[in-house]
């Protein structure tokens, strides 16, 4: 039986509601630059794989509003130490983005964006488990070719492809299959470098082995001009190669 795939695309949106924009301390020009740095631009297009799966969860607003891939509790979120918990107060350059929201605003933001996203995510996984008895999440991201100041890993040796894993939810066969598929296409591949881990709904995390997950991060230099955000000449090829890799996962 083919493996049912769910695409999780959390950081592709550029949308910032006016009520949130009004809280930001940076100019329009600075905001445009920050969106260019922090958005996983075009991942919703690169990972649009209609011949392989029609199951996808795409976060509708920018991560600068609320980041769905952070722990809700800042005490559990390592990035909160640099002002990038679930609600960012710092920019990628370690300057002020906004003041810390009060309890009321924080609750409103989480209820408006974070909680609905995770409900949809959990429900989508539950549906696949019910229908197919298993679910494979691909956590879809991209990364800058040079480390941004906020990043914990400042190493310059960045691969074409970064694969993020979880000891419980990423079986060896899955990691090996994805890694070998990208290598055969001519890409350099690193595991959990420069970014580590992969997402699973908390209802299943470390509990349900039928839920598998792997993060695929694409180096932006492969498909876009990082200084402008425009698509690069190899955009179509990278998109096709992602589809090739995903099709092999389905058949594994």
Pin down the residues of each PLM region.
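N-terminal catalytic or cofactor-binding beta/alpha core of small enzyme domains
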Residues: 1-137, 142-252
């Amino acid at each position: 039986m083919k493996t049912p795939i769910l695409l999780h695309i959390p950081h592709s949106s550029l949308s910032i509601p006016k009520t949130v924009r009004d809280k930001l301390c940076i100019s329009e020009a600075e905001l445009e630059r920050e969106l260019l740095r922090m958005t996983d631009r075009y991942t919703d297009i690169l990972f649009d794989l209609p011949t392989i799966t029609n199951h996808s969860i795409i976060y509708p607003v920018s991560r600068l509003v609320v980041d769905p891939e952070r722990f809700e509790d800042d005490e559990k979120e390592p990035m909160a130490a640099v002002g990038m918990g679930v609600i960012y107060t710092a920019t990628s350059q370690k300057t002020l983005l906004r003041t810390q929201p009060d309890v009321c605003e924080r609750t409103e933001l989480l209820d408006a964006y974070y909680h609905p996203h995770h409900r949809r995510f959990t429900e989508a996984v539950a549906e696949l488990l019910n229908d197919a008895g298993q679910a494979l999440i691909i956590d879809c991201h991209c990364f800058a070719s040079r480390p941004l100041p906020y990043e914990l890993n400042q190493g310059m040796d960045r691969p074409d492809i970064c694969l993020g894993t979880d000891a419980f939810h990423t079986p060896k066969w899955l990691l090996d299959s994805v890694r070998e598929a990208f290598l055969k296409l001519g890409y350099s591949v690193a595991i959990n470098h420069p970014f580590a881990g992969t997402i699973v709904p908390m209802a299943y995390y470390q509990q349900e082995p039928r839920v598998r997950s792997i993060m695929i991060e694409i180096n932006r230099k492969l498909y876009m001009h990082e200084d402008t955000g425009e698509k690069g000449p190899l955009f179509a090829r990278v998109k096709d190669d992602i589809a090739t890799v995903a099709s092999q996962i389905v058949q594994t």
